[in-house]
């Protein structure tokens, strides 16, 4: 047989010719612009009305006016577009036969062709009619969607089958190289997946992000489709462009059956993506409890350590308390720190899982972590400062009850003589007293270089190394409290704040700068009266007892209960009369 008579080659040549014709039509087709709209003829209006009402005899009369078929309304719809979205097949046939073939590919102003409109409308017979008449099956709408993709979105096996029988391109990419196989995997249509594969579908085809249909099925939790694709040769160990494995995608979807299936067929929980995240991190962040139960035993400690963060961090970041509890039950350390390269990617250089919970204002996760032994003092920016600035009284209470350093400084931007927390609580007496009741060094707010109201100079006290490790006193002395609170935009607060502070002191060394600012405040008469009179012996004893006990014992209720003191005295020592937040909640 002569090579020129090869039927396969003839078929390919015919296909190439058809594709060339289609490209010519695409290049030369009329684009409809609403601003070019001209009034429709009476014949066009009557023709469209006949289509919409299903009057075949009237339609046959009006299609004789060819110009009426070539007129579009303000939406860019020609009579053919109207015909494809109505259910009577004979009407479509009449309009299609009467229309010029160039109109078969014309798009509406929304970018839809007659075929994509028919598919979207779910009219299988209309789709078949268009295809049998020779409408090109591969023209995309302006969103980049092919008729095949739209048919799969509708879940119509019959439409997909009809399109495949008329030489639709199965692997034709849409936006971001998303293919029919990917869409079928996303929608979970096992029958359509089987049909596509039987017609030459590629199980290894990757989208614009390097994800295979297997990865898509795993992400969307379609276990039956996933298993079918695996049996058809899908690669369980395939990686996307960002390094994400199929198991990583399944962890994001959260279907435990998909994860179990992938593990059964050789999937590994120890393969990180390019960011270093493992499937266990993804499941913990997304809050997929059952998926996490599968992943914990198959993920190695070495892989987690190498990643630079723990699933505890991920669960706290994702605000997933149940997953957090599961991880703690399985022995994960709540005080594990982020690796330096990850920590440095955050502006605040956070380290702990607790910091994530506090930043998220997540009271439940904060409580779980603290109950499990989380140390609130491990981050460069102390968790307490974050909670105070966020005005979250409950998290501040929890942190202080579990040993947060109320006298901490933000070590990276430390330019105050006084501990940092108070500067975020000046507008909130409840928060201010919460800090003061728990041992804030209020005397530090009255140390400055201005001298007292009698003209005497103050002496700078030395800062203990354990309080401010690695910092010299010259850094701390830059900005005393009196300078801080008397700036023009905060000067109005000086009276109310100083009135609260003196409740926690024995001797008040008021400097000349503070005095001049206080004299114009409405609280000044009361403050002056307190300054002119000695403190009560009871109050002085309270302050002495607190100094002897130390912050650790004061802030832990269990230790306080061990003291052989009457409850009334215990409450007095703890400044319970000033515990405004506790009074709001009726706390003991």
UniProtKB/Swiss-Prot annotation:
Domain SOCS box, chain residue ranges per copy: 524-579
Top-level taxon in the UniProt lineage: Eukaryota
Keywords, comma-separated and alphabetical: ANK repeat, Repeat, Ubl conjugation pathway
One of the Pfam families matching this protein, by short name: Ank
One biological process term in Gene Ontology: intracellular signal transduction
Pathway given in the UniProt record: Protein modification; protein ubiquitination
Gene3D superfamilies from the UniProt entry: Ankyrin repeat-containing domain, SOCS box
The keyword Transcription appears for this protein: no
Ranges of the ANK repeats in the UniProt entry: 75-104, 110-139, 143-172, 176-205, 209-238, 242-271, 275-304, 307-336, 349-378, 379-408, 416-444
InterPro entries tied to this protein: Ankyrin_rpt (IPR002110), Ankyrin_rpt-contain_sf (IPR036770), SOCS_box (IPR001496), SOCS_box-like_dom_sf (IPR036036)
Cross-referenced SMART domains: ANK, SOCS_box
Entry function: May be a substrate-recognition component of a SCF-like ECS (Elongin-Cullin-SOCS-box protein) E3 ubiquitin-protein ligase complex which mediates the ubiquitination and subsequent proteasomal degradation of target proteins.
Domain notes per entry: The SOCS box domain mediates the interaction with the Elongin BC complex, an adapter module in different E3 ubiquitin-protein ligase complexes.
Family statement: Belongs to the ankyrin SOCS box (ASB) family.
Alphabetical list of PANTHER family matching this protein: ANKYRIN REPEAT AND PROTEIN KINASE DOMAIN-CONTAINING PROTEIN, ANKYRIN REPEAT AND SOCS BOX CONTAINING 15
Protein name: Ankyrin repeat and SOCS box protein 15
Organism per entry: Bos taurus
The gene coding this protein: ASB15
């Amino acid at each position: 047989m002569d090579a020129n008579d090869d039927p396969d080659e003839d078929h390919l040549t015919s296909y190439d010719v058809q594709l060339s014709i289609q490209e010519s039509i695409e290049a030369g087709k009329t684009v409809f612009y609403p601003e070019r709209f001209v009034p429709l003829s009476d014949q066009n209006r009557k023709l469209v009305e006949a289509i919409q009402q299903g009057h075949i005899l009237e339609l046959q009369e009006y299609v004789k006016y060819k110009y009426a078929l070539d007129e579009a309304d303000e939406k860019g719809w020609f009579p053919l577009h109207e015909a494809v979205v109505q259910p009577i097949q004979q009407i479509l046939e009449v309009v299609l036969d009467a229309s010029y073939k160039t109109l078969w590919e014309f798009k509406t102003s929304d970018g839809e062709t007659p075929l994509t409109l028919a598919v979207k409308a779910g009219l299988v017979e209309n789709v078949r009619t268009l295809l049998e008449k020779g409408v090109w099956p591969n023209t995309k709408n302006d969103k980049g969607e092919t008729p095949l993709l739209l048919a799969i979105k509708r879940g119509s096996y019959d439409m997909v089958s009809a399109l495949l029988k008329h030489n639709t391109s199965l692997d034709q990419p849409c936006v971001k190289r998303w293919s029919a196989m990917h869409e079928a995997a996303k929608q979970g249509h096992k029958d359509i997946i089987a049909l596509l594969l039987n017609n030459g579908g590629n199980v290894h085809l990757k989208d614009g992000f390097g994800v295979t249909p297997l990865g898509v099925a795993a992400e969307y939790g379609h276990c039956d489709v996933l298993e079918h694709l695996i049996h058809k040769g899908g690669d369980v160990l395939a990686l996307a462009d960002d390094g994400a494995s199929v198991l990583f995608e399944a962890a994001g979807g959260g279907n435990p059956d998909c994860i179990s299936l992938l593990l059964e067929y050789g999937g590994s929980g120890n393969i990180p993506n390019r960011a270093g995240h493992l499937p266990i991190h993804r499941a913990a962040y997304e809050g997929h409890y059952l998926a996490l139960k599968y992943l914990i035993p198959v993920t190695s400690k070495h892989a987690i350590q190498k990643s630079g963060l723990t699933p505890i961090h991920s669960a706290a970041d994702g605000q997933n308390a149940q997953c957090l509890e599961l991880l703690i039950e399985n022995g994960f350390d709540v005080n594990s720190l982020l690796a330096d390269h990850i920590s440095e990617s955050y502006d605040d250089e956070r380290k702990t899982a607790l910091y994530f919970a506090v930043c998220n204002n997540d009271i439940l996760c904060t409580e779980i972590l603290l109950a499990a032994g989380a140390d609130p003092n491990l981050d460069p920016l102390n968790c307490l400062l974050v909670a105070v600035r966020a005005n979250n009284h409950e998290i501040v209470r929890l942190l202080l009850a579990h040993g947060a350093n109320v006298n901490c400084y933000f070590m990276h931007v430390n330019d105050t003589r006084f501990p940092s927390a108070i500067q975020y609580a000046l507008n909130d007496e409840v928060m201010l007293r919460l800090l003061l009741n728990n041992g804030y060094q209020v005397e530090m707010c009255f140390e400055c270089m201005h001298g007292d109201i009698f003209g005497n100079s103050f002496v700078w006290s030395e800062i203990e190394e354990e309080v401010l490790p690695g910092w010299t006193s010259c850094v701390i002395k830059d900005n005393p409290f009196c300078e801080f609170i008397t700036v023009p935009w905060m000067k109005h607060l000086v009276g109310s704040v100083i009135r609260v502070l003196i409740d926690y002191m024995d001797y008040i060394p008021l400097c000349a700068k503070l005095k001049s600012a206080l004299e114009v405040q409405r609280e000044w008469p009361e403050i002056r009266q307190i300054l002119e009179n000695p403190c009560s012996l009871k109050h002085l004893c309270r302050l002495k007892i607190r100094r002897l006990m130390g912050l650790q014992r004061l802030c832990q209720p269990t230790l306080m209960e061990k003291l052989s003191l009457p409850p009334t005295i215990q409450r007095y020592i703890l400044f319970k009369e000033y515990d405004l937040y506790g009074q709001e909640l009726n706390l003991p």
